[in-house]
Amino acid sequence: MTVQEIKDFVLNKLGFKEMPDKYVLQFVNEIMDSLAIDYDSAGKKTTYTITATKGTWTDLPSDCIAVKRCFKDNSEYNYDDFIIENGQIQFNTDGTYTIEYLALQSHVTALNEVPGINIIFHEALSLGVAYKEACRNFMYDNDTVKSQLYVEYTSAKETAKSRASNSKRSRKRIKYADFF
């Protein structure tokens, strides 16, 4: 779904004739960042390798939102003995660490771009933009519609979260009928 399609959805949902492009882009970027922070499955995961010395603070990448997992020296086991503060990380032992983290998406700058979050969250993104536009427009005083849009937005976020977690499962249990 492109930003233009999101704008068309918002205009149709609210019954407006026009919405300034700068607000569409601003709202899409704000909600996209919010969804990536609130829901791991909405954002993109990236890895970063650090060679660290014990007790030394090392800068995390500038696009890092949150560290999800850390592995030491190409181990398959999760390493948890580290501290994160103010965009820096400190380890209690020397070594090479691979950090898996959530990264900020690239912000959209044009109406023909597709937002960089998981496609499952695009409906929630559209409803969030509709809610923000209804709140921004001072002449739109229908609080019932605003609250309904907010409920739809939060419901769409939760639905997308459950759909994303269901799609991650590689195997599903199949019930077999009794043999006899």
Regions found by a protein language model. Give the residues of each.
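Internal mixed-charge
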Residues: 1-6, 79-180
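Short, intrinsically disordered N-terminal pre-domain segments
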Residues: 1-26, 30, 173-180
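Hydrophobic beta-strand residues in large extracellular and virion-surface proteins
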Residues: 28, 50, 67-70, 82, ...
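Surface-exposed ligand/attachment interfaces on beta-rich extracellular proteins
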Residues: 48-61, 110-117
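Solvent-exposed beta-hairpin/edge-strand motifs
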Residues: 58-75
